[in-house]
Swiss-Prot record:
It comes from Apis mellifera ligustica (Common honeybee). Its EC number is 7.1.1.2. It is a multi-pass membrane protein. It is found in: Mitochondrion inner membrane. The chain crosses the membrane at residues 10-30, 57-77, 91-111, 121-141, 143-163, 170-190, 192-212, 242-262, 267-287, 313-333. This is NADH-ubiquinone oxidoreductase chain 2. Belongs to the complex I subunit 2 family.
Protein backbone atom coordinates (compact mmCIF):
# COMPACT_ATOMS: atom_id res chain seq x y z
CA UNK A 1 0.00 0.00 0.00
CA UNK A 2 2.85 2.39 0.87
CA UNK A 3 4.59 1.61 -2.43
CA UNK A 4 1.38 2.28 -4.37
CA UNK A 5 0.89 5.65 -2.68
CA UNK A 6 4.55 6.54 -3.23
CA UNK A 7 4.35 5.65 -6.91
CA UNK A 8 1.07 7.51 -7.33
CA UNK A 9 2.44 10.75 -5.88
CA UNK A 10 5.67 10.54 -7.83
CA UNK A 11 3.76 10.12 -11.08
CA UNK A 12 1.81 13.28 -10.27
CA UNK A 13 5.06 15.16 -9.62
CA UNK A 14 6.41 13.93 -12.97
CA UNK A 15 3.24 15.10 -14.71
CA UNK A 16 3.53 18.56 -13.13
CA UNK A 17 7.20 18.72 -14.14
CA UNK A 18 6.32 17.82 -17.74
CA UNK A 19 3.73 20.59 -17.83
CA UNK A 20 6.21 23.16 -16.47
CA UNK A 21 8.87 22.08 -19.00
CA UNK A 22 6.34 22.35 -21.82
CA UNK A 23 5.44 25.91 -20.82
CA UNK A 24 9.13 26.84 -20.98
CA UNK A 25 9.78 25.28 -24.39
CA UNK A 26 9.16 26.91 -27.76
CA UNK A 27 10.04 23.84 -29.83
CA UNK A 28 6.93 22.08 -31.16
CA UNK A 29 8.63 18.69 -31.45
CA UNK A 30 9.90 18.82 -27.86
CA UNK A 31 6.43 19.82 -26.68
CA UNK A 32 4.96 16.85 -28.54
CA UNK A 33 7.48 14.46 -26.92
CA UNK A 34 6.69 15.89 -23.48
CA UNK A 35 2.97 15.50 -24.16
CA UNK A 36 3.47 11.82 -25.10
CA UNK A 37 5.50 11.19 -21.94
CA UNK A 38 2.65 12.82 -20.06
CA UNK A 39 0.18 10.49 -21.79
CA UNK A 40 2.14 7.41 -20.66
CA UNK A 41 2.23 8.69 -17.08
CA UNK A 42 -1.48 9.58 -17.25
CA UNK A 43 -2.42 6.05 -18.31
CA UNK A 44 -0.35 4.70 -15.41
CA UNK A 45 -2.11 7.04 -12.97
CA UNK A 46 -5.53 5.97 -14.23
CA UNK A 47 -4.59 2.30 -13.73
CA UNK A 48 -3.17 2.69 -10.20
CA UNK A 49 -5.66 1.60 -7.51
CA UNK A 50 -8.30 0.84 -10.11
CA UNK A 51 -9.91 -2.53 -10.76
CA UNK A 52 -11.72 -1.24 -13.86
CA UNK A 53 -9.24 -0.95 -16.74
CA UNK A 54 -11.81 0.19 -19.30
CA UNK A 55 -11.22 3.97 -18.80
CA UNK A 56 -7.47 3.57 -19.31
CA UNK A 57 -8.05 1.49 -22.47
CA UNK A 58 -10.40 4.13 -23.85
CA UNK A 59 -7.97 6.94 -23.07
CA UNK A 60 -5.09 4.93 -24.55
CA UNK A 61 -7.02 4.30 -27.79
CA UNK A 62 -8.00 7.96 -28.14
CA UNK A 63 -4.43 9.09 -27.40
CA UNK A 64 -2.92 6.69 -29.94
CA UNK A 65 -5.23 7.89 -32.71
CA UNK A 66 -4.61 11.58 -32.00
CA UNK A 67 -0.86 11.10 -31.45
CA UNK A 68 -0.31 9.29 -34.76
CA UNK A 69 -2.07 12.02 -36.71
CA UNK A 70 -0.30 14.75 -34.73
CA UNK A 71 3.10 13.17 -35.36
CA UNK A 72 2.65 13.30 -39.13
CA UNK A 73 1.17 16.79 -38.94
CA UNK A 74 4.14 18.02 -36.91
CA UNK A 75 6.53 16.61 -39.53
CA UNK A 76 4.61 18.50 -42.21
CA UNK A 77 4.53 21.57 -39.96
CA UNK A 78 8.31 21.54 -39.48
CA UNK A 79 8.91 21.08 -43.21
CA UNK A 80 7.58 24.61 -43.83
CA UNK A 81 5.26 23.51 -46.63
CA UNK A 82 2.86 26.24 -47.68
CA UNK A 83 -0.09 23.96 -46.84
CA UNK A 84 0.75 24.32 -43.13
CA UNK A 85 -0.10 28.02 -43.31
CA UNK A 86 -3.68 27.38 -44.42
CA UNK A 87 -6.77 27.40 -42.21
CA UNK A 88 -7.54 23.83 -43.31
CA UNK A 89 -4.30 22.45 -41.85
CA UNK A 90 -4.76 24.56 -38.74
CA UNK A 91 -8.26 23.15 -38.19
CA UNK A 92 -7.12 19.56 -38.83
CA UNK A 93 -4.48 19.85 -36.11
CA UNK A 94 -6.98 21.39 -33.71
CA UNK A 95 -9.43 18.56 -34.32
CA UNK A 96 -6.83 16.05 -33.13
CA UNK A 97 -6.38 18.06 -29.94
CA UNK A 98 -10.15 18.31 -29.52
CA UNK A 99 -10.29 14.52 -29.77
CA UNK A 100 -7.64 14.21 -27.06
CA UNK A 101 -9.32 16.59 -24.60
CA UNK A 102 -12.82 15.26 -25.34
CA UNK A 103 -14.61 18.33 -26.65
CA UNK A 104 -17.57 18.29 -29.04
CA UNK A 105 -18.05 16.23 -31.23
CA UNK A 106 -15.64 13.82 -29.49
CA UNK A 107 -17.21 14.19 -26.05
CA UNK A 108 -18.85 10.76 -25.80
CA UNK A 109 -15.70 8.88 -24.81
CA UNK A 110 -14.97 11.26 -21.95
CA UNK A 111 -18.50 11.24 -20.52
CA UNK A 112 -18.62 7.44 -20.79
CA UNK A 113 -15.21 7.08 -19.10
CA UNK A 114 -16.04 9.42 -16.20
CA UNK A 115 -18.91 7.17 -15.17
CA UNK A 116 -16.46 4.29 -14.58
CA UNK A 117 -13.71 6.32 -12.87
CA UNK A 118 -13.19 7.03 -9.20
CA UNK A 119 -12.97 10.61 -7.95
CA UNK A 120 -9.16 10.76 -7.95
CA UNK A 121 -9.05 9.70 -11.59
CA UNK A 122 -11.70 12.28 -12.47
CA UNK A 123 -9.65 15.01 -10.80
CA UNK A 124 -6.56 14.14 -12.84
CA UNK A 125 -8.51 13.87 -16.10
CA UNK A 126 -10.09 17.28 -15.49
CA UNK A 127 -6.87 19.10 -14.57
CA UNK A 128 -3.30 18.02 -15.36
CA UNK A 129 -4.11 15.51 -18.10
CA UNK A 130 -6.27 18.17 -19.79
CA UNK A 131 -3.95 21.18 -19.41
CA UNK A 132 -0.99 19.64 -21.28
CA UNK A 133 -2.67 19.10 -24.69
CA UNK A 134 -4.51 22.43 -24.39
CA UNK A 135 -1.23 24.28 -23.95
CA UNK A 136 0.37 22.53 -26.92
CA UNK A 137 -2.67 23.19 -29.11
CA UNK A 138 -2.52 26.94 -28.46
CA UNK A 139 1.26 26.91 -29.00
CA UNK A 140 1.07 25.03 -32.30
CA UNK A 141 -2.09 26.41 -33.90
CA UNK A 142 -3.78 29.73 -34.50
CA UNK A 143 -7.01 30.48 -32.67
CA UNK A 144 -8.96 31.98 -35.56
CA UNK A 145 -12.65 32.64 -36.19
CA UNK A 146 -13.28 28.99 -37.15
CA UNK A 147 -11.82 27.84 -33.84
CA UNK A 148 -14.00 30.29 -31.93
CA UNK A 149 -17.11 29.13 -33.80
CA UNK A 150 -16.24 25.55 -32.91
CA UNK A 151 -15.53 26.30 -29.24
CA UNK A 152 -18.68 28.34 -28.70
CA UNK A 153 -20.70 25.58 -30.39
CA UNK A 154 -19.10 23.15 -27.93
CA UNK A 155 -20.12 25.35 -24.99
CA UNK A 156 -23.72 25.76 -26.14
CA UNK A 157 -24.17 22.10 -27.01
CA UNK A 158 -22.68 20.78 -23.76
CA UNK A 159 -24.70 23.21 -21.61
CA UNK A 160 -27.89 21.77 -23.16
CA UNK A 161 -26.58 18.19 -23.27
CA UNK A 162 -25.68 18.16 -19.56
CA UNK A 163 -29.33 18.65 -18.62
CA UNK A 164 -30.19 15.07 -19.63
CA UNK A 165 -27.88 13.38 -17.11
CA UNK A 166 -28.87 12.32 -13.62
CA UNK A 167 -25.44 11.23 -12.36
CA UNK A 168 -22.98 13.58 -10.73
CA UNK A 169 -19.96 12.16 -12.55
CA UNK A 170 -21.46 12.70 -16.00
CA UNK A 171 -22.46 16.23 -15.06
CA UNK A 172 -18.89 16.98 -13.97
CA UNK A 173 -17.65 15.48 -17.23
CA UNK A 174 -19.86 17.91 -19.15
CA UNK A 175 -18.66 20.73 -16.91
CA UNK A 176 -15.03 19.87 -17.68
CA UNK A 177 -15.76 19.87 -21.42
CA UNK A 178 -17.58 23.18 -21.07
CA UNK A 179 -14.62 24.79 -19.27
CA UNK A 180 -12.32 23.91 -22.17
CA UNK A 181 -13.43 27.14 -23.85
CA UNK A 182 -12.20 29.19 -20.87
CA UNK A 183 -8.83 27.45 -20.77
CA UNK A 184 -8.15 27.78 -24.51
CA UNK A 185 -9.41 31.33 -24.90
CA UNK A 186 -7.70 32.68 -21.77
CA UNK A 187 -4.40 31.04 -22.77
CA UNK A 188 -4.67 32.70 -26.19
CA UNK A 189 -5.27 36.12 -24.61
CA UNK A 190 -3.00 36.07 -21.57
CA UNK A 191 -0.61 33.31 -20.48
CA UNK A 192 -0.19 34.66 -16.93
CA UNK A 193 -3.95 34.74 -16.46
CA UNK A 194 -4.10 31.15 -17.72
CA UNK A 195 -1.58 30.03 -15.09
CA UNK A 196 -3.56 31.81 -12.37
CA UNK A 197 -6.77 30.20 -13.62
CA UNK A 198 -5.49 26.62 -13.68
CA UNK A 199 -4.07 26.99 -10.16
CA UNK A 200 -7.34 28.40 -8.80
CA UNK A 201 -9.46 25.94 -10.79
CA UNK A 202 -7.38 22.95 -9.66
CA UNK A 203 -7.58 24.06 -6.02
CA UNK A 204 -11.37 24.49 -6.10
CA UNK A 205 -11.83 21.24 -8.00
CA UNK A 206 -9.59 19.42 -5.52
CA UNK A 207 -11.72 20.62 -2.60
CA UNK A 208 -14.91 19.47 -4.31
CA UNK A 209 -13.52 16.10 -5.38
CA UNK A 210 -12.03 15.47 -1.91
CA UNK A 211 -15.43 16.12 -0.36
CA UNK A 212 -17.21 13.78 -2.79
CA UNK A 213 -14.56 11.10 -2.31
CA UNK A 214 -14.57 11.34 1.50
CA UNK A 215 -18.32 10.77 1.76
CA UNK A 216 -18.53 8.43 -1.26
CA UNK A 217 -21.07 10.58 -3.09
CA UNK A 218 -21.64 9.02 -6.52
CA UNK A 219 -25.00 10.33 -7.74
CA UNK A 220 -27.88 12.64 -6.87
CA UNK A 221 -29.38 10.21 -4.36
CA UNK A 222 -26.96 11.14 -1.60
CA UNK A 223 -28.06 12.21 1.86
CA UNK A 224 -26.08 14.44 4.22
CA UNK A 225 -25.52 13.67 7.88
CA UNK A 226 -26.31 17.21 8.98
CA UNK A 227 -26.96 20.70 7.70
CA UNK A 228 -23.31 21.76 8.09
CA UNK A 229 -22.16 19.06 5.72
CA UNK A 230 -24.80 20.27 3.30
CA UNK A 231 -23.60 23.89 3.62
CA UNK A 232 -20.08 22.77 2.80
CA UNK A 233 -21.28 21.04 -0.34
CA UNK A 234 -23.27 24.12 -1.41
CA UNK A 235 -20.25 26.37 -0.88
CA UNK A 236 -17.98 24.07 -2.88
CA UNK A 237 -20.48 23.80 -5.74
CA UNK A 238 -21.00 27.57 -5.95
CA UNK A 239 -17.25 28.09 -5.87
CA UNK A 240 -16.65 25.53 -8.62
CA UNK A 241 -19.42 26.97 -10.83
CA UNK A 242 -17.69 30.41 -10.83
CA UNK A 243 -20.71 32.02 -9.24
CA UNK A 244 -20.52 35.78 -8.37
CA UNK A 245 -18.98 36.81 -5.00
CA UNK A 246 -16.77 33.71 -5.14
CA UNK A 247 -13.09 34.05 -5.97
CA UNK A 248 -13.37 31.75 -8.99
CA UNK A 249 -15.73 34.28 -10.61
CA UNK A 250 -12.84 36.77 -10.84
CA UNK A 251 -11.35 34.72 -13.68
CA UNK A 252 -14.61 34.82 -15.63
CA UNK A 253 -15.00 38.52 -14.84
CA UNK A 254 -11.52 39.36 -16.15
CA UNK A 255 -12.18 37.34 -19.31
CA UNK A 256 -15.41 39.28 -19.89
CA UNK A 257 -13.53 42.56 -19.38
CA UNK A 258 -10.90 41.59 -21.97
CA UNK A 259 -13.55 40.48 -24.45
CA UNK A 260 -15.53 43.70 -24.04
CA UNK A 261 -12.40 45.72 -24.82
CA UNK A 262 -12.18 43.94 -28.20
CA UNK A 263 -15.37 44.67 -30.15
CA UNK A 264 -14.75 41.73 -32.48
CA UNK A 265 -15.47 39.38 -29.54
CA UNK A 266 -18.85 40.88 -28.61
CA UNK A 267 -20.85 38.19 -30.40
CA UNK A 268 -18.75 35.48 -28.69
CA UNK A 269 -19.35 37.14 -25.33
CA UNK A 270 -23.12 37.12 -25.90
CA UNK A 271 -23.17 33.40 -26.75
CA UNK A 272 -20.76 32.63 -23.90
CA UNK A 273 -23.05 34.33 -21.38
CA UNK A 274 -26.01 32.28 -22.62
CA UNK A 275 -24.10 28.99 -22.40
CA UNK A 276 -22.67 29.95 -19.00
CA UNK A 277 -26.13 30.69 -17.59
CA UNK A 278 -27.40 27.36 -18.92
CA UNK A 279 -24.49 25.53 -17.29
CA UNK A 280 -25.05 27.30 -13.98
CA UNK A 281 -28.70 26.27 -14.24
CA UNK A 282 -27.56 22.63 -14.35
CA UNK A 283 -25.65 23.20 -11.10
CA UNK A 284 -28.69 24.89 -9.54
CA UNK A 285 -30.77 21.80 -10.33
CA UNK A 286 -28.39 19.81 -8.10
CA UNK A 287 -28.63 22.40 -5.34
CA UNK A 288 -32.42 22.43 -5.61
CA UNK A 289 -32.48 18.69 -4.95
CA UNK A 290 -30.20 19.21 -1.96
CA UNK A 291 -32.58 21.80 -0.48
CA UNK A 292 -35.60 19.58 -1.08
CA UNK A 293 -33.91 16.65 0.63
CA UNK A 294 -32.85 18.88 3.50
CA UNK A 295 -36.46 19.87 4.16
CA UNK A 296 -37.68 16.28 3.82
CA UNK A 297 -34.98 14.61 5.93
CA UNK A 298 -34.24 17.40 8.41
CA UNK A 299 -35.63 15.34 11.29
CA UNK A 300 -33.15 12.57 10.48
CA UNK A 301 -30.09 14.82 10.76
CA UNK A 302 -27.66 13.85 13.48
CA UNK A 303 -27.70 16.11 16.53
CA UNK A 304 -25.35 18.99 15.73
CA UNK A 305 -23.91 19.16 19.24
CA UNK A 306 -22.90 15.52 19.41
CA UNK A 307 -21.68 14.64 15.96
CA UNK A 308 -18.17 14.57 14.55
CA UNK A 309 -19.09 16.50 11.40
CA UNK A 310 -19.28 19.86 13.14
CA UNK A 311 -16.01 20.97 11.54
CA UNK A 312 -17.79 21.22 8.18
CA UNK A 313 -19.55 24.35 9.36
CA UNK A 314 -16.23 26.01 10.17
CA UNK A 315 -14.73 24.91 6.86
CA UNK A 316 -17.68 26.23 4.85
CA UNK A 317 -17.67 29.53 6.74
CA UNK A 318 -13.89 29.94 6.33
CA UNK A 319 -14.00 29.13 2.61
CA UNK A 320 -16.91 31.51 2.03
CA UNK A 321 -15.21 34.33 3.97
CA UNK A 322 -11.95 33.76 2.10
CA UNK A 323 -13.68 33.92 -1.29
CA UNK A 324 -15.72 37.03 -0.51
CA UNK A 325 -12.71 38.85 1.00
CA UNK A 326 -10.49 38.22 -2.01
CA UNK A 327 -13.33 38.99 -4.41
CA UNK A 328 -13.79 42.43 -2.81
CA UNK A 329 -10.03 43.02 -2.59
CA UNK A 330 -9.35 42.21 -6.25
CA UNK A 331 -12.27 44.14 -7.70
CA UNK A 332 -13.20 47.07 -5.48
CA UNK A 333 -10.04 48.16 -3.65
Amino acid sequence: MFFMNFKYHWFIYFLITIFVLMMNSNNIFIQWMLMEFGTIISISLINIKSTNKTPSLIYYSVSVISSIFLFFMIIVYLSSISFTKTDTFNFMVQMMFFLKIGTFPFHFWMIYSYEMMNWKQIFLMSTLIKFIPIYMMVSMTKINSWTLYFLITNSLYISFYANKFYTLKKLLACSTIFNSFYFIFILELNKNMFIAMIILYSFNYFLLISFLNKFNIQNFNFMFYNKYQMYTFLTLMFNYSMYPIFLSFVIKWNLIFMMVSVKAYNWILFLLMISSMLMIWNYIIILKRVFLKMNFYKNNFIDDKDNKYMYHSYFALTLLSFNISFFITLNFL
